[in-house]
C-alpha cells in the first residue's frame, strides 16, 4: 500500500485532502472485491493452482476511470484469458460509482460494521458472495493509509492543542479489555482545526505522553503555545520535556464536574453559584479571594472541593493571564469534546471491537468523515490571532507562519 501511494503520487500531508483519501479507500475496496469476484468465477484463488479445475486463468488488469462525488478515480479491473468474466460490482459500460454505492461502501467502514454485516451488505446490494475472512483482508488494506496519516507532516506552530481520551472495549488474547484512545486536536495559527493524531493505549503515564510529544516534534511541530487537557496523568511532565515553554490549561468544566459530583441536590445550586465567582472572576487575584471565601463557607461540609481546586490551581488558573477572546478559546475543551461526541455516535452500536486495529480503522474513517466539514476558522480568529501575536511575540518571531 505504501508503494501504491508513492507510485500514484498520493501523499497525505496535512489531513485536509479528504477527497483524495476517500477515493483511495474506495479504490482499495472495489479492487479487492473485484479480485475476489474473479476468484469465485474461476473457482480458485491467485497462485492456488492445486485447486484449479478450469482451462481459464487470470490475464492481468485493465484500467477504468470511475466518476465519483469525490472526483475521478482509476480502478484496476481484473481480466480472464477466455474473456468470460463479466464484473458484477462494476458493469462493463458503467463509468460512475453511484452516490448510493459510495455511501454503502464507506459506511461499511465508518459505521464500524462487522465483517458479517458487510458480507450481508454486499450480497443484498450486488448479489456478490464474499466471505467475512476475505472482507477482513480487504479492510486491513486501509491500515497503511492510517499509518501514513498518523505520520504526515504537521504545522510548525499550533496556537492550541487539545488533549483528551475516549474509552472503548476491545478483545485481546481472549479477554475483553478497556482501551483508551488519546486524541490530539490542534488549532493552527490560521485558526483551522485538525486532528493531529489518535493513539490507542491501556493507561496514561508520563512515558506514554512523552512518546506522543516526541512524535509531534518529529512531524515538524516546533512549538505549541497552549495545551488544554482534562487532568491527564503524566501529561505536564511529558510536554515540559519536549515543549518546555508550552502553557498548560486544565479544563475548567471537567474540574467543576469532578469536584462537585458528590454534592447533595439541596446544596448544589448555591454551591455552584459560589464556585462560579471563582472561575468567572475577572482576575486571578479576585479568583483566589473568592476561593478562600468558598473554603470558609463550604469546607466543613465538602472539604475535597477546595482541596482539589487549590492543589490544581497552577494549571486551572492559566487562562486568567490572557485577554477575553483567548480565554474563551481555552476555557474548556469543548472543541475536542464535540469531536468525541461525534465519534461516540458512530461507535455507540459497537460494544466490543475485535482488535485494536479494527478500532483504529473505524475511528480514522469516522474522523475523515467528520473533519471534511472543517473548512473555515472561528469567526473571532482575527482578534484571537492579534492577541496571540502580542502575548507570544518572542516565540513567534522568525516562524514560518
Regions found by a protein language model. Name each.
Residues 78-81, 89-93, 128, 141-229, ...:
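RNase H-like nuclease fold core
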Residues 244, 277-401:
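Acidic/histidine-rich catalytic cores and adjacent linkers
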Residues 86, 259-287, 293:
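Metal-dependent DNA phosphodiester-chemistry modules and their immediately adjacent helices/loops
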Residues 45-48, 52-53, 113-160:
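Electropositive nucleic-acid engagement tracts
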Residues 226-233, 238-274:
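Conserved beta-strand -> loop -> alpha-helix junction used to position metal-binding or nucleic-acid-contacting
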Residues 53-111, 127-140, 156, 206:
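Basic, short loop/linker segments at the boundary and entry of helix-turn-helix/winged-helix-like folds
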Residues 1-93:
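Short, conserved DNA-binding cores of transcription-related domains
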Amino acid at each position: 500500500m505504501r508503494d501504491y501511494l508513492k507510485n500514484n503520487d498520493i501523499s497525505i500531508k496535512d489531513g485536509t485532502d479528504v477527497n483524495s483519501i476517500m477515493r483511495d479507500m474506495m479504490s482499495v475496496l472495489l479492487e479487492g472485491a473485484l479480485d475476489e469476484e474473479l476468484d469465485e468465477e474461476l473457482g480458485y484463488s491467485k497462485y492456488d493452482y492445486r485447486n484449479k479445475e478450469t482451462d481459464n486463468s487470470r490475464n492481468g488488469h485493465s484500467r477504468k476511470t470511475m466518476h465519483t462525488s469525490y472526483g475521478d478515480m482509476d480502478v484496476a479491473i481484473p481480466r480472464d484469458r477466455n474473456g468470460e468474466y463479466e464484473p458484477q460490482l462494476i458493469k462493463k459500460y458503467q463509468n460512475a460509482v453511484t452516490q448510493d454505492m459510495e455511501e454503502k461502501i464507506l459506511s461499511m467502514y465508518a459505521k464500524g460494521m462487522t465483517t458479517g454485516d458487510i458480507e450481508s451488505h454486499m450480497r443484498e446490494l450486488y448479489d456478490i458472495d464474499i466471505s467475512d475472512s476475505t472482507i477482513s483482508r480487504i479492510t486491513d488494506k486501509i491500515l497503511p493509509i492510517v499509518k501514513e496519516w498518523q505520520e504526515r507532516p504537521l504545522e510548525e506552530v499550533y496556537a492550541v492543542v487539545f488533549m483528551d481520551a475516549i474509552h472503548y472495549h476491545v478483545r485481546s488474547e481472549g479477554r475483553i479489555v478497556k482501551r483508551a484512545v488519546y486524541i490530539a486536536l490542534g488549532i493552527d495559527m490560521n485558526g483551522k482545526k485538525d486532528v493531529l493524531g489518535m493513539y490507542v493505549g491501556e493507561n496514561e503515564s508520563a512515558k506514554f505522553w512523552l512518546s506522543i510529544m516526541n512524535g509531534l516534534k518529529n512531524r515538524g511541530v516546533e512549538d505549541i503555545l497552549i495545551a488544554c487537557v482534562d487532568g491527564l496523568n503524566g501529561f505536564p511532565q511529558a510536554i515540559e520535556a519536549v515543549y518546555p515553554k508550552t502553557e498548560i490549561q486544565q479544563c475548567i468544566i471537567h474540574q467543576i464536574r469532578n469536584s462537585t459530583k458528590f454534592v447533595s441536590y439541596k446544596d448544589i445550586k448555591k454551591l455552584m453559584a459560589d464556585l462560579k465567582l471563582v472561575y468567572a472572576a475577572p482576575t486571578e487575584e479576585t479568583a483566589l479571594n473568592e476561593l478562600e471565601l468558598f473554603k470558609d463557607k463550604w469546607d466543613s461540609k465538602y472539604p475535597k472541593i477546595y482541596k482539589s481546586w487549590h492543589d490544581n490551581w497552577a494549571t486551572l488558573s492559566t487562562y486568567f493571564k490572557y485577554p477575553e477572546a483567548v480565554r474563551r478559546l481555552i476555557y474548556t475543551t469543548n472543541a475536542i469534546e464535540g469531536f468525541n461526541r461525534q465519534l461516540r455516535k458512530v461507535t455507540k452500536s459497537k460494544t466490543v471491537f475485535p482488535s485494536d486495529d479494527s478500532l483504529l480503522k473505524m475511528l480514522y474513517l469516522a474522523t475523515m468523515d467528520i473533519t471534511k466539514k472543517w473548512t473555515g476558522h472561528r469567526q473571532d480568529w482575527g482578534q484571537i490571532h492579534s492577541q496571540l501575536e502580542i502575548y507570544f511575540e518572542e516565540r513567534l518571531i522568525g516562524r514560518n507562519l
